[in-house]
UniProtKB/Swiss-Prot annotation:
Gene designation per UniProt: KRTAP9-3
An annotated Gene Ontology molecular function: identical protein binding
Oligomer and partners: Interacts with hair keratins.
Protein name (database record): Keratin-associated protein 9-3
Organism of provenance: Homo sapiens
16 X 5 AA repeats of C-C-[RQVSHE]-[SPTN]-[TASPI]: annotated segments: 8-157
Cellular-component GO terms for this entry: cytosol; keratin filament
Keywords, ordered alphabetically: Keratin, Repeat
Family designation: Belongs to the KRTAP type 9 family.
Pfam family, one: Keratin_B2_2
Length: 159
């Protein structure tokens, strides 16, 4: 029998903070849903930054916006973007930050989103970072053990 997603599911089959519960087949006694859950089958539509894995939801906008898979290629709609968040595709001006890049996905790339400068996402872009407090939220990996700051794009894997 399947069980509804609650804060006690296997890490590979459930999100702990689902906007809409996810059905799983097995549960455990501890909170779960690690970033390894970030695959297309896991990242279902959600409209709040806390409803999905933080590697799946976009959290750099003024208003929540739905995503249907990991790391949507564009930032957000015009009313959503913060002034320093996005490029022209989000209805913002050229003053947008050049380091707004795609967040870590299960199958990630380190390419710039529209509005990023080309040099933002070069070979030197993806550096280790382990605490969101030390870096740009779009650049820092949040599931490592030792913090290292970066100032550009996210790295393909956590550690």
């Amino acid at each position: 029998m399947t069980h509804c997603c609650s804060p006690c599911c296997q890490p590979t089959c459930c999100r702990t903070t689902c906007w809409q519960p996810t059905t799983v087949t097995t549960c455990s006694s501890t909170p779960c849903c690690q970033p390894s859950c970030c695959v297309s089958s896991c990242c279902q539509p959600c409209c709040h930054p806390t409803c999905c894995q933080n590697t799946c939801c976009r959290t750099t906008c003024c208003q929540p916006i739905c995503v249907t898979s990991c790391c949507q290629p564009s930032c957000c709609s015009t009313p959503c973007c913060q002034p320093t968040c996005c490029g022209s595709s989000c209805g913002q001006s050229s003053s947008c930050a050049p380091v707004y890049c795609r967040r870590t996905c299960y199958h990630p790339t380190s390419v710039c989103l529209p509005g990023c400068l080309n040099q933002s996402c070069g070979s030197n872009c993806c550096q280790p970072c382990c605490r969101p407090a030390c870096c740009e939220t779009t650049c820092c990996r949040t599931t490592c053990f030792q913090p290292t700051c970066v100032y550009s794009c996210c790295q393909p894997s956590c550690c």
